């Protein structure tokens, strides 16, 4: 399609989405859940078609030299497919936030007022790799009464179109508008430019992908954006940490999965326990993955450089390492004087995503969660828990590190807003 065709195509997509959003806003919980379960059934029967489409994408990705992190996100295997099916059930089982009325109060004037939760309207989502996001985002949009326009990456085109076919069939089975969920049928980047500027038809944009994509969307969008740039997550091992917990959590936070935004990228260790505990943590992390590379500040080098178990896994950290989301088996390690320096380092170099303290000291734990300026702050738990499913939100449409509207994992409630409702009996303002 040429530029004029793309503009016309996107304008039509936007108009249909706006019309569908009005019908969805009026849909009851039963109708929305029926749509989710109809999509579940169609998807389950189309497993081989979807996995075959994904294999085409994976083969193309390997031919095009996609990096390991992107290939990991792109892949759909049996476990991830089953997770997609379960995700639909989980979202259907969640309480419906739409229509919830809170904070009802009487005013001296005689009016009775409160707040009602309502859909945002039309959500535009732009994302890379992860074809399961297509289904997760669609399910959350439907349950929260929003229409959604989905633009996946070209590397996942075949997978996304196969999933879109199932969504469309499921919607038709229950008589819901086929425009409630639209997966764009073009990989032309001009479509993204149109989507993020269609203020008449789109109420919010949610980008998920690399830092370059997020920065471009944030810079060029005229529609409000819910976003996070990257996931430079920290774990701080305090002087009062339980050694067993420190080792276990550090290994999980770094090695559980590399291509995710809640993976630990920097390990901070209090100097009071570094000599004793850091070698044990480092050895455990390298044992979990022999490909691991540890990038050390001067103090960490002094402790670890003579460790024969870690030979071939160590190098000196540079200033850039403290600001880097690796998405790879690379971990930066820094020795600090204590919690003051840890909080300062995290707030200076972190991405305000998820940060962790390992400590048995209640006072320090409470100070950490108050003063660290991140969307999720954890005590004695892996940063990998920063996830919509783990937080009980069902699927998540993304994670926001912004402070306005939604922060942290964005589930159903993050796709809604509140309007004031007022009941009266003929009251007039004096």
Swiss-Prot record:
GO terms for biological process: L-proline biosynthetic process. Keywords: Amino-acid biosynthesis, Cytoplasm, NADP, Oxidoreductase, Proline biosynthesis. Pfam families: Aldedh. Pathway: Amino-acid biosynthesis; L-proline biosynthesis; L-glutamate 5-semialdehyde from L-glutamate: step 2/2. Transmembrane segments: none annotated. It is found in: Cytoplasm. It comes from the Bacteria. Its EC number is 1.2.1.41. It catalyses: L-glutamate 5-semialdehyde + phosphate + NADP(+) = L-glutamyl 5-phosphate + NADPH + H(+). Belongs to the gamma-glutamyl phosphate reductase family. This is Gamma-glutamyl phosphate reductase. It comes from Psychrobacter arcticus (strain DSM 17307 / VKM B-2377 / 273-4).
């Amino acid at each position: 399609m040429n530029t004029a065709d793309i503009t016309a195509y996107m304008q039509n997509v936007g108009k249909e989405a706006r019309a569908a959003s009005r019908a969805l806003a009026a849909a009851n919980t039963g109708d929305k859940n029926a749509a989710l379960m109809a999509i579940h059934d169609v998807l389950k029967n189309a497993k081989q078609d979807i996995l075959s489409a994904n294999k085409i994408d994976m083969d193309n990705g390997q031919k095009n030299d996609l990096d390991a992190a992107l290939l990991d996100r792109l892949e759909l295997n049996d476990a991830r497919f089953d997770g997609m099916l379960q995700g639909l059930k989980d979202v259907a089982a969640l309480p419906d936030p739409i229509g919830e009325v809170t904070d009802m109060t009487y005013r001296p004037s005689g009016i009775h007022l409160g707040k009602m939760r309502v859909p945002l309207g039309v959500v535009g989502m732009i994302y890379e790799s992860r074809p399961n996001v297509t289904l997760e985002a669609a399910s959350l949009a439907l349950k929260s009464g929003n229409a959604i326009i989905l633009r996946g990456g070209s590397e996942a085109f075949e997978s996304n179109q196969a999933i879109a076919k199932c969504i469309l069939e499921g919607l038709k089975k229950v008589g819901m508008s086929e425009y409630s969920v639209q997966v764009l049928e073009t990989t032309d980047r001009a479509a993204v430019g149109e989507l993020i500027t269609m203020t008449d038809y789109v109420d919010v944009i949610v980008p998920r992908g690399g830092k370059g994509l997020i920065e471009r969307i944030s810079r060029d969008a005229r529609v409000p954006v819910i976003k996070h740039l990257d996931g430079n997550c920290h774990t701080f091992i305090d002087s009062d940490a339980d050694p067993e917990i420190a080792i276990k959590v550090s290994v999980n936070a770094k090695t559980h999965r590399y291509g995710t935004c809640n993976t630990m990228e920097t390990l901070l260790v209090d100097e009071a326990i570094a000599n004793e505990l850091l070698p044990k943590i480092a050895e455990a992390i390298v044992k979990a993955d022999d490909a691991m590379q540890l990038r050390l500040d001067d103090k960490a080098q002094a402790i670890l450089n003579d460790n024969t178990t870690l030979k071939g896994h160590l190098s000196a950290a540079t200033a850039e390492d403290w600001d880097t989301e690796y998405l790879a088996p690379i971990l930066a390690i820094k020795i600090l004087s204590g919690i003051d320096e840890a909080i300062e380092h995290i707030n200076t170099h972190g991405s305000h995503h998820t940060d962790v303290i390992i400590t048995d000291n209640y006072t320090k734990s409470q100070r950490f969660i108050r003063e660290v300026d991140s969307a999720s702050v954890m005590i004695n738990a892996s940063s990998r828990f920063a996830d919509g499913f783990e937080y009980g939100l069902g699927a998540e449409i993304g994670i926001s590190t912004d402070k306005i509207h939604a922060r942290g994992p964005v589930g159903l409630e993050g796709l809604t807003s509140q309007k004031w409702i007022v009941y009266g009996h003929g009251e007039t303002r004096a």
